[in-house]
């Protein structure tokens, strides 16, 4: 069996909350790796009974040694956790397995008893299945940890509330750069090396795609980012442009390069997924052009006369490479957010929750982030401005069309977006769109300038406002934090067309 790692952060977060999970049922769809097992063991120490836990994994992120260790603890692990049929799409296979797993687990764990059931999901499939099968009387709270999963369920009438870890500020601000670094490191370790002259396309300008671009641009002559959302960046006519790239990295969580574009790809192109499942490149269509390979981590060479491409990791995310541990100690942040969400879900009153998909409270997030910085990861390892744990935030709810500040005004606050969408305009032209987890306002505070852009809400939004003096005090005592802040500010100034010399 594989040894189980430990995360001091998760234990510290749980120890600081006076709650007990005795009698709670946990049904989960998760990566069956050391990270998840470590979190579950921490939950066992606050009363969760392993016999009340049922989990199902995904073929590309299930390690057999971890499965054995989980079963030795008394956890029920579904036999189809590592099932893989290469000529069938993963989502089709997985949904079928999850439907059976949930029906069997619900019947077995809830028969003859009244108990709170927490559904912990990665990808939205478990929550969607539960919503279709259960009636309104079920005592259920859901948790979703991925943006793709949140998108899958956000329009569904599930009949129970879902805690939205996926779009929490802490996850977006801190985890995305860490995952981007891991994806990049893993991808390039598994190739012979990519020349600096290679043209790279990243599909998806979300948190992961943007962080990947930041990592790759200093190393390569051409790194383009494609996103179909309005206002994200310079449009790319993908069908006409796709043949010009040597490497394509998918980070949309959806199908960014469908089968209809496969024969337009440049010969020898390298395809790597940085999202979830195998949907980024319609990978099943590429796998059907090859002899079936039962190893979902195989790098597949597709060369059938019409398509010449290498599909890394059979189209699955390259940061899952078959190892028992995905990432390093920095994964403690994600595990702590999930553990805190399980504790919250165990006692939350559904009728009193503010919305069907509430965010984990910013106070909880700040507590977790502060502990994360102190216990597990040096500040220098983070490439986003770490300010969620500072006291002094004021929560703002703004209507669509509301202007936070105007270009040329005096700068006196820093902002973090909890939910909604805002846009930044320079001379009346939209230059940037901002969503949950984004922060803004630091550039002018650091440079002692007036506002270089106007920022207004595109839809009803919730923000957290920090006074400029508190912002300055936080940076004054921490040289590493100050350096990160200046780096972010320089990027913002250049995006707005201002001179970097204004920072001096």
Swiss-Prot record:
This is Uncharacterized protein MT0113. One of its GO terms (cellular component) is plasma membrane. It is a multi-pass membrane protein. The chain crosses the membrane at residues 146-166, 196-216, 330-350. InterPro entries: Adenosylhomocyst_ase-like_sf, cNMP-bd_dom, cNMP-bd_dom_sf, Env_Response_Regulators, NAD(P)-bd_dom_sf, RmlC-like_jellyroll. A nucleoside 3',5'-cyclic phosphate binds at residues 372-492. GO terms for molecular function: DNA-binding transcription factor activity. The keyword Cell membrane applies. It comes from the Bacteria. Keywords: Cell membrane, Membrane, Transmembrane, Transmembrane helix. It is found in: Cell membrane.
